[in-house]
């Protein structure tokens, strides 16, 4: 089985040096043919080595054995043909968004950030009105919030501030439905099809997909068709997951579905390029126009990323 280290070592090569050699070139995307499909990864994490100290302070344990830096990510994107990516800071780094914002500053065309914010901290409410004034910040990503009412302030505040919200909290579709209905101007994006490793292990995959599909009736809700290789029990092209992807595509349509990888998870399951071709070559029910939306146009439009 290919380890994460082997995957990176075999993929980076000379690309690592080229990613840092010319800052001016890094700021400007390469000229591409007019007909090229724009590929946007709706979820990638970045984590630098210094975060190990932060993890220790917070008493957290990282889920990846090594840092995954900007310098590692850029060559992977270049080789696979990924034009842009939405950085979602990993939950094990606490509520730090600084490294993701650093990536957006260094590569403003290629990266933007969905930042993390502590929902139980009463001081967080004051941050939302000016949240998007941080260069490169597009919105907020939340997961695992409490149902004790301590997070209730967040949804109307995010709606008022015009902040898109990505969320992952499987098994709580009824709660999401109430939020979507009460806040129709709030952009809500379900991460990873509403699935998690724990859901799969518990044998509740079909239930989770059904719940996510049920939210499609709310026009302000959309879904990332992301991380399928991580949950599949098969090798590429992960045909056991094709019916689930099809179910959500039929429910939401191409303009509310987004391709993404969460690339640091599941390196052994697929290369970055295979994660692209899984959608562009193996999902035969998708038209070319569908792929244009799902692979990039839709997430840019939904997040207002120009």
State what each model feature region is:
Residues 2-19, 28-42, 55-84, 247, ...:
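Mid-to-C-terminal alpha-helical segments outside catalytic/metal-binding sites
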Residues 43-49, 192:
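Histidine-centered divalent metal-coordination motifs
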Residues 74, 101-102, 129, 177, ...:
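Active-site phosphate/pyrophosphate- and oxyanion-stabilizing loops and adjacent acidic/basic residues
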Residues 83-84, 93-171, 178-180, 222-228, ...:
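Active-site gating/metal-coordination segments in enzymes
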Residues 88-94, 298:
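Short, solvent-exposed turn/loop segments enriched in Gly/Ser/Thr/Pro and often Arg
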Residues 95-110, 243-250, 275-282:
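Short, electropositive alpha-helical surface patch
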Residues 146-258:
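Catalytic pocket-lining loop regions of alpha/beta-barrel enzymes
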Residues 262:
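Active-site glycine-centered loops adjacent to acidic/histidine catalytic or metal-binding residues
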